[in-house]
């Protein structure tokens, strides 16, 4: 059953390169949209929030390498191949590569009512330096 669901999603997904000289692709599948992103060593995004009146949020799926996901005020969670993280709307977080390893992941935006993304401050070198 899981394989069939994965195949159906793959059949309906459309990939488009969204940046030059990077491994970032836009993905559109049914009502979901997202990015397949490759992150070199030491790469991480800023803190951000996926807002929505209802529904919304983000799903992260590690497809290669090793990375981290962290909710503000909590310990970072290591992500390895196959790990899937469901982030509800209105949760401040960041995600990116481990300090010593490349990381590739799918970042899927969950459909929601009146959804938007708010990009915030960078993850500090001090915060990032705590990762193993």
Residue ranges and their predicted role:
Residues 1-35, 46, 116-132:
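A short, N-terminal "cap"/entry segment at the start of jelly-roll beta-barrel domains
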Residues 59, 73-90:
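Short acidic-glycine-tyrosine-enriched beta hairpin
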Residues 59, 86, 100-119:
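A short hydrophobic beta-strand segment most commonly corresponding to one strand
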């Amino acid at each position: 059953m899981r394989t069939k669901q994965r195949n159906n999603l793959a059949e309906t997904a459309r990939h488009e390169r969204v940046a030059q000289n990077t491994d970032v692709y836009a993905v559109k599948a049914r009502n979901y949209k997202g990015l397949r992103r490759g992150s070199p060593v030491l790469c991480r995004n800023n803190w951000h929030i996926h807002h929505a009146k209802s529904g919304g949020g983000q799903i992260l799926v590690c497809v290669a390498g090793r990375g981290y996901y962290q909710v503000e005020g909590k310990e970072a969670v290591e992500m390895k191949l196959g790990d899937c993280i469901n982030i509800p709307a209105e949760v401040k977080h960041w995600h990116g590569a481990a300090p010593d390893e490349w990381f590739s992941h799918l970042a899927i935006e969950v459909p929601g009512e009146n959804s938007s993304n708010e990009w915030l401050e960078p993850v500090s070198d001090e915060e990032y330096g705590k990762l193993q």
